[in-house]
Curated annotation (Swiss-Prot):
Name of the protein this chain belongs to: Probable transaldolase
Family: Belongs to the transaldolase family. Type 3B subfamily.
Subcellular location: Cytoplasm
Annotated organism of origin: Bacteroides fragilis (strain ATCC 25285 / DSM 2151 / CCUG 4856 / JCM 11019 / LMG 10263 / NCTC 9343 / Onslow / VPI 2553 / EN-2)
Active site per the UniProt annotation: 87 (schiff-base intermediate with substrate)
NCBIfam families recorded: fsa_talC_mipB
PROSITE patterns: TRANSALDOLASE_1 (PS01054)
Membrane-spanning parts: none
Any one annotated GO CC term: cytoplasm
Keywords, ordered alphabetically: Cytoplasm, Pentose shunt, Schiff base, Transferase
SUPFAM superfamilies xref list: Aldolase (SSF51569)
Function: Transaldolase is important for the balance of metabolites in the pentose-phosphate pathway.
Record-linked HAMAP family: Transaldolase_3b
Reaction(s) the record says it catalyses: D-sedoheptulose 7-phosphate + D-glyceraldehyde 3-phosphate = D-erythrose 4-phosphate + beta-D-fructose 6-phosphate
Gene that encodes the chain: tal
Amino acid sequence: MKFFIDTANLDQIREAHDLGVLDGVTTNPSLMAKEGIKGVENQRRHYVEICNIVQGDVSAEVIATDYEGMVREGKELAALNPHIVVKVPCIADGIKAIKHFSGQGIRTNCTLVFSTGQALLAAKAGATYVSPFVGRLDDICEDGVGLVADIVRMYRFYNYPTQVLAASIRSSKHIMECVEAGADVATCPLSAIKGLLNHPLTDAGLKKFLEDYKKVNE
């Protein structure tokens, strides 16, 4: 299991990196806007900054929704840094663009995936990653983790190399459910990653150890 952090916040990326478990970063236009990063050039400089911190895969999303625009933007993004993975929406022109990028050796992340059919087309087109959105499916009372498990089974059955990148993860519980479902990657907020450390018995045990140490060393 690889851990990606889903943010454009450099401080959070550095903190996750310093923890020693970070494998990559996913971003999107909403996360860029949240950080107040405006303008194409500023956003691209930001992607390079992220790549310099992480030294792992960084998903950078195209804004265009037409084939020619996605291909143009994707090539420009991929040229920024070898760690860039071009993030492409799961629409008809997006699948065409992924096929093109695959032929050019440009890695891709097919995003906004909500069904096994979409995941199948992404894999057939040669996507490096496919991103099923767990939390957003849960929001409409569908089984997001179940979709992750279904995609994993399908890819294994047909030996597709596309990696399942579980996205829209809201909690530490989501992470562990996706681990059990066989996801290759979980991209999540820093709070969910750090939440994996939390257990009351760990806190109680550490407190007891320290108290006992003080008793014999006073």
